[in-house]
Design a protein with these regions (language model features):
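Blade-loop segments of beta-propeller domains
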Residues: 28-29
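Beta-rich carbohydrate-recognition and catalytic domains
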Residues: 67-68
């Protein structure tokens, strides 16, 4: 409703949905559920992107998510699913009730970083942050390349498009990068745009 029809917090259904989401936000600031009790920067960012677009950008709950996202970045300035940085598979969701902390020395995931950057791009203040710009450069460096992790690892996933945006693909990445203020003259952006011309 938010992406396709522009619904915002004035609509009772959106207000009720936001209230529900805020009710299960963790003390740390993230949203959990899709991976059980495991951290999920992409899940938290995906929810928060819609909240920002629905008019909650100044809400304290949203601010807490941004603080959490910045605290859980990899050392290279991107994001990854923390349990993946510990070489865990999806079975960790059922087997581990304890939340697995990330190994921040491991590389970022382009898929996760692209999803997280969408919430930064949606927010008028955070889109101008140095952290968003650093992560944007990382995302561009991976265009048409394989991800570092198992989830949607193949380079072919760059060309599996969806709207509303869900995972990171070429269109969602270009949309995000443009909102972050990157120039169309960047080499990787030119290469990405050339794909559409061919």
């Amino acid at each position: 409703l938010v992406e396709e029809f522009g619904f915002c917090k004035e609509h009772p259904a959106i207000a009720k949905a936001a209230e529900y989401l805020f009710s299960f936000q963790s003390k740390e600031g993230d949203f959990r559920g899709i991976y059980g009790n495991q951290y999920s920067p992409n899940y938290s960012a995906g929810i928060t992107e819609l909240l920002v677009k629905a008019g909650y950008r100044n809400d304290a709950h949203v601010q807490r998510v941004f603080e959490w996202l910045l605290s859980i970045r990899q050392e290279d300035a991107g994001w990854a699913i923390p349990f993946r940085t510990r070489n865990c598979n999806l079975d960790v969701i059922a087997k581990h009730s304890e939340t697995i902390r990330p190994d921040k020395s491991k590389p970022f995931s382009y898929m996760v970083t692209g999803v997280v950057l969408r919430v930064f791009a949606a927010h008028p203040t955070y889109r101008k942050s140095k952290e968003a710009h650093q992560a944007g450069k990382l995302l561009l460096s991976m265009v048409f390349k394989k991800d570092h992790y198992l989830d949607r690892a193949g380079a072919e996933y760059w060309l599996r498009f969806s709207f509303p945006f869900w995972f990171t693909d070429l269109i969602s990445a270009l949309d995000t990068i443009s909102l972050l203020g990157f120039s169309a003259q960047e080499t990787q952006i030119e290469q990405a745009l050339q794909w559409f011309v061919k």
